[in-house]
From Swiss-Prot:
GO terms for cellular component: extracellular region. Provides adhesiveness to the mussel's foot. Mussels produce one of the strongest water insoluble glues. The mussel's adhesive is a bundle of threads, called a byssus, formed by a fibrous collagenous core coated with adhesive proteins. This is Foot protein 1 variant 1. Its main location: secreted.
Amino acid sequence: MARNMNILTLFAVLIGSASAVYHPPSWTAWIAPKPWTAWKVHPPAWTAWKAHPPAWTAWKATPKPWTAWKAPPPAWTAWKATPKPWTAWKAPPPTWTAWKATPKPWTAWKAPPPAWTAWKATLKPWTAWKATPKPWTAWKATPKPWTAWKATPKPWTAWKATPKPWTAWKATPKPWTVWKATPKPWTAWKATPKPWTAWKAPPPAWSAWKATPKPWTVWKATPKPWTAWKATPKPWTAWKATPKPWTVWKATPKPWTAWKAPPPAWTAWKATPKPWTAWKAPPPTWTAWKATPKPWTAWKAPPPAWSAWKATPKPWTAWKATPKPWTAWKATPKPWTAWKATPKPWTAWKVPPPAWTAWKAHPPAWTAWKATPKPWTAWKAPPPAWTAWKATPKPWTAWKAPPPAWTAWKATPKPWTAWKATPKPWTVWKATPKPWTAWRATPPPTWTAWHGHGYGGYGKPGKPGKPGSKGPRGPAGPPGATGKTGRTGATGKRGPPGYPGKPGVPGRNGYVHIVFDGYGKWEIGKIERKNIREAVAKAWTAWNAGHGHGWTAWTAPPAYG
C-alpha cells in the first residue's frame, strides 16, 4: 500500500505539474470536471484520500492514517513486539474477519464515516462501479470523458481541428511543405542551380545524372576531375621518387615495372595499347582468356599454359601425384626441419625434380621469380611498366590533369560552400519559425500534453525505451565511462552511481518510469525512497538541459514525499 501511495503521489504530482503548465489545453479535461470525480466527490470514502484530514498527507502527519498499523507503543519494531502494530488485523475481537467487522483495522485509510467496510457499505467508493451514474458510465454515457474523441472540441481535436499542432502536416504552409512546395530545400536536387552544384561546378549540377555533359563524363573525358591525381608534383610523387622505399624489391627490372611503364595513362582502360595489354601481350587482348597463347602462359612456361588446368600433366598434378609435395608434413625429416637444415625442403620450389616443381616445369616458371625473363614479365613488358607511377604522363594522370575538379576542395567556390552558403537547404533547422516549431511552440500544443511524460506502471521493470535524441554529455564519474543522457544501451553505459539514461539504483518499491515519449526515456529503477527525489530531479533537469522543448516549463522536478 505504501508503495501504491508513493506511485500515486508521483503520478498525481506529475499530472498536476503538467496541468499547471498547460492551461487551457483540452487535456485539462482530464482534470476538470472529471468523469471519475465521483471517486473524489463527497461523501465517497475514496475522497478520504484527499479529504481533511487527508489520509495521504498523513504520510507525514500525526497521527498517520495507518498509525493503526503501528499504534503506540509498538512501532515497526513491533514486528517482534507485543502487541503487534497489526495485531489489529488479528487481535480479538476482530481478526481478519475485520474485513467484515466494524470498525476495520484499516478504517484509518479512509477516515469516518466510510471505512474499508465500504466494500459492503452504502455508499461505497466503488459503488459507482455499479451505481448510476458510474465514473465510467461515461464510457457509454454522454458526454463521455473521451467523447472528446468524437465530440467537439476534443482534447485532441487539434488532431483534426484548425489550427492543429500538426496541422502543418496537412495545412499550408506545412513544416514540410517544402517536401512538395517550390522551392524546396532539396528542389535543388532537381532544380538549377543546385545547392551542391558547387560539387560539380557549372554547368552540370546533380541533374547531370541525366544531363550532358555528365559530372562524371570526366571519367571518360579529358581533362578528368581527378587528373590532378596525375599532376606534377603529386602528394605521392614520393611513391615515385628515386630511390623508392620499395625499390628494394631490389630486382631490375622490377616484376611490376610493367605496372608503371609509360606511356599509357589510365585512360588507356579504353585506349590502345592498354597499360595492361602486357597482361595479354599482342595480339590477344582480354579475349586471350580463351585465346592461344594465353597472356599468362608466362606463368606456366611452355608447353603448359593456363590451359594446363585441363592439360596433362597439370601443374598441380603433384597434389595427387606420389610422392606429394607435402607428404613431408608427415614424413621424416619434416619439410620445415629444413628451416635449419640443409638442403631445405622447399629448395624444391626452385630446383627440379620435385613434383611441386610442376608449378615451374622446365624451365621452371616459379624459378622465374629470379629468372629472366620472368613468367610475368608479360605483366610488365615495355613499353608500359609499373614505373608509370613515376613516369610522365602517368597512367592515371587522367585522375589529376588540370583543370582538376577535385582541386575544388581548395578552390573557390568550394563544392560544399552550399553547406555554409545562404540560404542553406537546412537553414530551416535554425531558421525562425521552424517547420516543427508547432511541435514546441508556447503555449504548447494540446497533443504534446499526451507526450510530456507518463507513468510507467508499478511493480515490474518497464521495457527499455527506444533510443532518444542524444543529450548533453554527462559528467565523468566512477567507474570512468561517461554516458550521454537520453540514450540507453551502448551510448550510456551502465555504471554507478547511476545517471539519467542508465538503469536506476535498486530499492524496495519496485520500478518507476519517467517516460519522455518521442525522445527516449529514462528508467529510474528500484528507487529507494530516500533517493527518489534526487533521482527524479536529476532526470527532470537533465531532460530540460538536453532538450529545448516547449514543455521545458516543467523545469520544477515533481515533489515527492
